[in-house]
A protein has these predicted regions:
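Short, glycine-/Ser/Thr-/acidic-enriched flexible segments
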Residues: 14, 66, 146-148, 155-157, ...
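Catalytic domains of carbohydrate-active enzymes, especially glycoside hydrolases
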Residues: 263-284
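Catalytic core of carbohydrate-active enzymes
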Residues: 375, 402, 428-433, 445-666, ...
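An acidic-aromatic substrate-binding cleft motif
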Residues: 195-258, 278, 285
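Aromatic- and carboxylate-enriched substrate-binding clefts and catalytic-loop regions
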Residues: 23-32, 277-487, 518-523, 527-532, ...
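Beta-sheet entry/capping signal
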Residues: 6-7, 49-51, 58, 67, ...
Length: 701
């Protein structure tokens, strides 16, 4: 037992003792101290049944069949029960469990295009498959609405059948010769996710700059030659890019070779010139790029530091993409040589993005690599908080990194469509930090899709602008008007919502994800399945229904959205203020090209800040609360230094805000004293209240 309601079942008929799963390279699924005290442990016999009882569950083992049943003592209901003996075959073990007709299942990691698995089969397998139906980052963990979760303690691939082939039975298998699983029993998603985190680690809280758009490309490899069909640059000429020397101008990070407009520095300038938010930059995201053109690794590190210094002056952090091993190897050329310690300590790297070139083998390999990087970034980066974006992960990845969904083609509605349930499912699998490329890495040339992708991802954790591979440049201003202004507006809105987003991000470290399935707040037969897979909640107060298809669009992209389910309560169109009654499904919702269908729940309290382009522009001495008075509601904001690991030691500040509307339409807003502290926290703040009302107030006091 790993606590009163976590039970480990280990069985190896070949005689092996309880152990960690084999991992090459070495990695650990469990944290160093996964156990919690057990309040009591009573073993008894009742007829043909052996019982093991803790303070919260009773494990019943049938003497004749060895089948196991686990009862939740709080309800005296059976949470989970074996349907058949464990089946051991050569290189495969199968566990069969009973399931009821009203039971639903979630988890399995980043299962592209899916989140609710009742009656389906999912692969717990490193597939390197990035489109609908593929698996971008598997996790051998799922949970049931019946009140249990299961973690299979293995690095081997598996398959989970939730009643697809055999109705009434869940068949779970992994390519392993023994059984090692953890049963977690509790009520609700949050409690079961917390049990999963107890065993495998809490998700990281991303640094604040990570919530801003990032730009990724290679700026140390290609040559640019004038071509009338090429890309238009600031000098008024068009250039075509080539990875081979075509007689053109070679790019570099810092633009010191009369090549500034092709440099990484120019990217930062470009975002500033177009007044677009930018939080971070990866200048080597491309095979064979490197980050310097000198004959030595140290010379290239100095080149990288020069870019980092320039970026930091402009409020932007830098990071690196990984192609090769991150530690020096003499046989590798200076161009591709890596030294992650010097990159972090000397050059100031604070972001790392993995790819199939490095972690594509998946399973323990990806977990091993990011474990190393996370420790180095903190130790050599002045206790800096690692920002790692990975894929091909496993159980435990969440304690070090966020996930991106891989390489896909933008410019098509399918790109948006399948990503919505993908994001929802990632959070239900214990990985709240999920992202994808803005309008895809490939394709493009569809302004409507580009705009709609920027819109809905305003209400997600991260945004990756992966440039250099598409049919057009991947800048938010690339399509001109109206796309430029619309994309800027939503990027600015994302920056304004930072206090709200950061607060729900902190909440996701110990439970409820940021991007929430509708049933997490409003469970009913309609929300538990796939009916609401194309909408979600962003925290407790925003309901987002992305435009994910061409329903009846005109040539400008103005359209309507069908099938928006508003749960019980009152919902307000965030952009018009129109009030909608919940408990209904709305069709033909007007969605002109500028407008994302997004609703705020009446009673909401939204902490905000002024529009900004990066974290350094946020005024720490001014706080904004936007309030929609209705009944009695509350919200607790969270803040910390946003850059270090000190939040893990409790260095943060929480502030509770309450709103109360009485029967006489009197509104009382209470901001309680802040609790906590962190380095740089200023207790003296001005406060701005934005209280949404239906008419001018009679009096304010």
């Amino acid at each position: 037992f790993y606590g009163d309601n976590i039970f480990r079942l280990f069985r190896d008929d070949s005689g092996g003792i309880i152990r960690d799963p084999k991992a090459e390279p070495e990695a650990k699924i469990l944290v160093d101290q996964p156990r919690k005290p057990v309040s009591r442990l009573d073993v008894g016999t009742e007829g043909d049944t052996v019982t093991i009882t803790t303070g919260k569950i009773r494990v019943e083992i049938d003497k004749k069949t060895s089948l196991i049943k686990i009862v939740d003592l709080k309800t005296e209901a059976v949470a989970v029960e074996q349907a058949a003996p464990v089946l051991f075959e050569k290189g495969k073990t199968t566990l069969s469990l009973k399931t009821g007709p009203e039971e639903y299942f979630y988890g399995g990691g980043v299962q592209n295009g899916r989140f609710s698995h009742k009656g389906k089969v999912i692969s717990i397998e490193n597939q390197n498959s990035w489109t609908d139906g593929g698996v971008a980052s598997p996790t051998p963990f799922y949970w049931s609405t019946n009140g249990y979760g299961l973690l299979w303690h293995t690095f081997k691939k598996g398959q989970y059948d939730f009643g697809a082939k055999e109705k009434g039975t869940v068949n779970l298998s992994h390519d392993e010769n023994y059984l090692d699983v953890f049963f977690m029993v509790d009520d609700g998603a949050v409690n079961l996710l917390r049990k999963f985190y107890q065993l495998t680690g809490n998700p990281v809280l991303l640094p604040k700059f990570a919530f801003y758009q990032g730009h990724l490309n290679a700026y140390n490899r290609d040559y640019w030659k004038e071509d009338e069909k090429g890309i238009l640059f600031e000098d008024g000429k068009r250039y075509k890019e080539s990875q081979k020397d075509n007689g053109g101008i070679r790019e570099s990070l810092n633009g010191e070779l009369d090549n500034y407009q092709f440099s990484a520095r120019a990217v930062i300038d470009r975002y500033k010139a177009h007044d677009m938010p930018l939080g971070w930059l990866l200048p080597n995201d491309g095979y064979g790029a490197g980050y310097g053109q000198t004959d030595t690794l140290d010379g290239n590190i100095a080149n990288l530091k020069s870019l980092a210094d320039y970026a930091l002056k402009n409020g932007v952090e830098i990071g690196l993409w990984t192609q090769s091993d991150l530690h020096p190897k003499p046989e590798i050329s200076a161009l591709l040589q890596r030294d992650i310690v010097k990159e972090v300590r000397d050059a100031g790297v604070r972001v790392l993005k993995t790819d199939v070139a490095w972690v594509g083998a998946g399973y323990s390999f990806g977990l091993n690599g990011i474990t190393d990087v996370a420790q180095i970034m903190t130790y050599y980066g002045n206790n800096s908080r690692p920002f790692i974006i990975s894929l091909d992960g496993w159980a435990g990845t969440q304690r070090y990194a966020g996930i991106w969904t891989g390489d896909q083609t933008g410019g098509a509605w399918e790109y948006i469509r399948f990503h919505i349930p993908t994001y929802i499912g990632s959070g239900l699998s214990g990985q709240p930090n999920i992202c994808s490329d803005m309008d895809g890495i490939f394709g493009g040339k569809n302004p409507a899709v580009n705009i709609r992708d920027f819109q809905w991802k305003t209400f997600t954790p991260m945004e990756l602008n992966m440039d250099g591979w598409g049919a057009n440049e991947k800048y938010p201003h690339v399509f001109g008007e109206p796309a430029t202004s619309i994309n800027r507006w939503y990027l600015k809105l994302k920056s304004e919502l930072m206090p709200y987003a950061y607060s729900i991000a902190e909440e996701s470290v110990s439970g409820m994800p940021m991007v929430r399935a509708m049933f997490l707040e409003y469970p009913n037969p309609y929300t538990l399945g796939k009916a609401t897979q194309y909408q979600f909640l962003f925290g407790p107060y925003f309901l987002v229904a992305p435009v994910y298809q061409d329903t009846n669009a005109d040539k400008e992209g103005n359209d309507v959205r069908h099938g928006i389910y508003l749960p019980e309560g009152q919902w307000i169109d965030y952009f018009t203020g129109d009030l909608y009654e919940g408990g209904k499904i709305y069709n033909c919702f007007d969605a002109p090209v500028w407008k994302l269908p997004v609703f705020v729940k009446n009673g909401a309290i939204i902490p905000m800040t002024g529009p900004n382009n990066n974290v350094s522009e946020i005024n720490p001495n001014h706080r904004i609360y936007e309030i929609y008075p209705h009944g009695r509601t509350s919200f607790t904001t969270y803040d910390d230094d946003g850059v270090t690991e000190e939040y893990r030691q409790g260095r943060g500040v929480k502030t509770r805000i309450e709103s109360a509307l009485d029967g006489s339409n009197n509104v009382t807003v209470t901001v309680h004293p802040s609790v906590g502290d962190f380095n740089g926290f200023d207790k003296k703040k001005s406060t701005e209240f934005r209280i949404n009302v239906t008419r001018k107030p009679d009096k304010v006091s």
